[in-house]
């Protein structure tokens, strides 16, 4: 019985390159990494975050003065996993240009907005969605109260950071993230989540 990850890895295309030493084959994502392109696809969770962080650190060590391009197609996910990626993006020396392909929702939208100002893009038919962090903790009443307090603290911190990245007042961010708030690529530009809609490679 094959699990989903086995099937997924079997479907990743291989690229053959001619080199002075003969042929070399790469999976498509490794080949794109050579071009300083990282794909953030699917749910944001700890394992994926560790891989993204490792790639960011590797590309910084390779060329600290060259931009990194982070392509995002994600419904969001774990706040702590997302913050590991976000903090690394801010920490490393290269500028991280973010590009939304498909969708950037929840933590995906936050990471999109966290790219280098002036280098954050959406493709024309992509969608962006912002909202408040979700809580699903179960347990004793006192523990639930502790987790509720933690979520409120995280919500306020994320809103402050989103306000900083978009240039929107905190009160507006608080109101607009109270419920799921979907935006087209153009609306995401107007809101300040990204800087431009990219239709053709320049």
Swiss-Prot record:
CDD domains: S14_ClpP_2. It catalyses: Hydrolysis of proteins to small peptides in the presence of ATP and magnesium. alpha-casein is the usual test substrate. In the absence of ATP, only oligopeptides shorter than five residues are hydrolyzed (such as succinyl-Leu-Tyr-|-NHMec, and Leu-Tyr-Leu-|-Tyr-Trp, in which cleavage of the -Tyr-|-Leu- and -Tyr-|-Trp bonds also occurs). PROSITE patterns: CLP_PROTEASE_HIS, CLP_PROTEASE_SER. The keyword Cytoplasm applies. SUPFAM superfamilies: ClpP/crotonase. Pfam families: CLP_protease. It is found in: Cytoplasm. The keyword Ligase does not apply. Its main location: cytoplasm. GO terms for molecular function: ATP-dependent peptidase activity; ATPase binding; serine-type endopeptidase activity. One of its GO terms (biological process) is protein quality control for misfolded or incompletely synthesized proteins. Keywords: Cytoplasm, Hydrolase, Protease, Serine protease. The active site is at 106 (nucleophile), 131. It is an enzyme of class 3 (hydrolase). Signal peptide: none annotated. One of its GO terms (cellular component) is cytoplasm. Its EC number is 3.4.21.92. Fourteen ClpP subunits assemble into 2 heptameric rings which stack back to back to give a disk-like structure with a central cavity, resembling the structure of eukaryotic proteasomes. Belongs to the peptidase S14 family. Cleaves peptides in various proteins in a process that requires ATP hydrolysis. Has a chymotrypsin-like activity. Plays a major role in the degradation of misfolded proteins. HAMAP family: ClpP (MF_00444). This is ATP-dependent Clp protease proteolytic subunit. The gene is clpP.
